[in-house]
Amino acid sequence: MKKKNLLLMLLAVMALLLIPVSVQAAAAKPGTVKLSSIKAVDYNKINIKWKKTSGTTNYIVYYKEAGSKKWIKIKTLDNTKSSYTHTSSSKYPIVVGQKYTYTVKAYNKKTKKSGRYSKTGLTTRTVPAT
């Protein structure tokens, strides 16, 4: 009886070893976001588009007044998005007649790594109010 139980236990262990296990390779940093276009679509709205990159769970959109050194984080989007329209608000204002520069950074929530981003970004001037 002991031999039978031992044999059954041994077979069970061997069966478990044959079950495929998915192994995830160490994830690399997300790729660099390539900015496609920027356009002031109204006096208080600016649209930015980019190409998706691999290894990304989120895209983080930043803006600054042209010439400024400090990027301001304005929105975090999921990885299904490849564009964002920034609408002026009290927290993230857009002033008529000013130039604004935007950039987008790829981020991976699982690995907590960010991809490289365009430090020069894309710049546009707001359109006059009508």
Features from the language model and the residues they span:
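Sec-dependent N-terminal signal peptides of Gram-positive bacterial secreted proteins and lipoproteins
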Residues: 2-25
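An aromatic-rich alpha-helical recognition segment common to small helix-rich domains
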Residues: 33, 48-50, 61, 86, ...
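Solvent-exposed strand-loop boundary residues in beta-sheet-rich modules
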Residues: 54, 65-69, 110-112
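Residues that flank catalytic or metal-binding motifs in active/ligand-binding sites
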Residues: 57, 82, 100, 121
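Recognizes extended acidic, P/S/T-rich segments that occur
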Residues: 60-95
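Beta-strand-rich modules
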Residues: 86-115
